[in-house]
């Protein structure tokens, strides 16, 4: 059995979080983030980084909550990563990059806004996957902003092809990109 099969089997065993549990975990991660940010803003040393026993406990609980949120949502990462297969990176690399996006989502999630975490995380995971593909999938790296422009150009060309039935001219493409 391969390590990918083992990994996929392992993440399938973890329970999804209920909406209430998501909110609880999100609040704990936020509390931890406030304490860690306080220390980082102070330059990583000094009194701001000297945590009380209660604060150390909050950080530990926050780390556990963060790990639980990540573990419970790895299926979402795999699902999205599979959609990006065949575009220049191996599935395991895509899963790794998607997990980085998921981690960012856990850190930035604000449960007070009332959104489900998976809805919020979806964007961050896709962002991580798209960023990885644009920076790692080519022999010559193209900057992300240029890659985004290429994507818009391809989309405009495809839409014009569907409308007209023939390849668009350069002028037609330029005009359609102005309106995007």
State each model region's role.
Residues 175:
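Alpha-helical residues within the helix-turn-helix
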Residues 1-141, 148-163, 172:
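Alpha-helical promoter-recognition and RNA polymerase-docking modules of transcription initiation factors
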Residues 178-180:
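Conserved small/polar residues in nucleotide/adenosyl-binding loops
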């Amino acid at each position: 059995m391969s390590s990918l099969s083992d990994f996929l089997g392992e993440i399938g065993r973890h329970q999804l979080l209920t909406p209430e549990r998501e909110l609880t975990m999100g609040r704990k991660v936020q509390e931890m983030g406030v304490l860690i940010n306080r220390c980082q803003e102070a330059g990583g040393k000094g009194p701001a980084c000297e945590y009380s026993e209660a604060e150390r406990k909050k950080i530990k609980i926050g780390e556990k909550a963060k790990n639980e949120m990540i573990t419970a949502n790895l299926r979402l990462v795999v699902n999205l990563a599979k959609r990006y297969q065949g575009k220049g990176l191996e599935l395991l690399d895509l899963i790794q990059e998607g997990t980085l996006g998921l981690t960012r989502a856990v850190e930035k999630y604000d449960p007070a806004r009332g959104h489900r975490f998976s809805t919020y995380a979806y964007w961050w995971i896709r962002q991580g996957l798209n960023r990885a593909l644009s920076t790692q999938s080519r022999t010559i790296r193209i900057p992300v902003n240029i890659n985004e422009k290429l994507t818009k150009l391809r989309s405009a060309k495809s839409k014009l092809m569907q409308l007209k039935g023939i390849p668009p001219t350069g002028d037609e493409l330029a005009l359609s990109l102005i309106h995007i």
